[in-house]
Structures are given as C-alpha cells and as structure tokens.
Amino acid sequence: MSEANVNKKEKGQKKVRTGYVVSDKMAKTIVVELEDRKQHALYGKIMRRNSRVKAHDEEGLAGVGDRVRIEETRPLSKDKHFRLLDIVEKAR
C-alpha cells in the first residue's frame, strides 16, 4: 500500500435534494422550497415541514414553478450553499 493511499481521506457524498422554484428574481440565484416528511415518534402521523434555500443558477435556466434538483456545495455567499444540477420538470 502506498503512502498516498494511507493519508487520503474519503469525502462524504454531497446532499442532493429535489424541490420547487418559488423565486427567480435575483441574478444567478433561485429560491427553492424543499419538503421534509417525518413520521411522529409517538402518534405515527406524517408531519410535513417546508424550508427555503437559495441555489446558484449560472445560466438562469430555472423559472418559478419548475421542479429542480440541487446539490450541496461550498458556501457561495452568506446564505447560498446549493447549486442547480438539473431541471426535472418545467412549469406549465
């Protein structure tokens, strides 16, 4: 085993999430609403929780209502930590 292989650390997978674009008014930035579903520990009811994140859209391809996939990345600004991977479904 070489020394390079011993010192190399495995990096974890980046988070990939799917959500809907709710705003595209900023330059090269979209706001994506993500839905998180969890089951209540005691009662078993499915609880829904929405969060909004800003994502980098270099070409400005995504529009409001589009379903998109975003990937976690290094901080690009104060609150932009995701980038657009692809558009899953265009809005009608």
UniProtKB/Swiss-Prot annotation:
Annotated PROSITE patterns: RIBOSOMAL_S17
SUPFAM superfamilies: Nucleic acid-binding proteins (SSF50249)
InterPro entries: NA-bd_OB-fold (IPR012340), Ribosomal_uS17 (IPR000266), Ribosomal_uS17_bact/chlr (IPR019984), Ribosomal_uS17_CS (IPR019979)
Keyword Ribosomal protein part of the UniProt annotation: yes
GO CC terms: cytosolic small ribosomal subunit
Top-level taxon of the source organism: Bacteria
GO MF annotation terms: rRNA binding; structural constituent of ribosome
Disulfides per UniProt: none
GO biological process: translation
Protein family per UniProt: Belongs to the universal ribosomal protein uS17 family.
Protein function: One of the primary rRNA binding proteins, it binds specifically to the 5'-end of 16S ribosomal RNA.
Subunit structure: Part of the 30S ribosomal subunit.
Protein name: Small ribosomal subunit protein uS17
Organism field: Corynebacterium urealyticum (strain ATCC 43042 / DSM 7109)
Organism phylogeny: Bacteria, Bacillati, Actinomycetota, Actinomycetes, Mycobacteriales
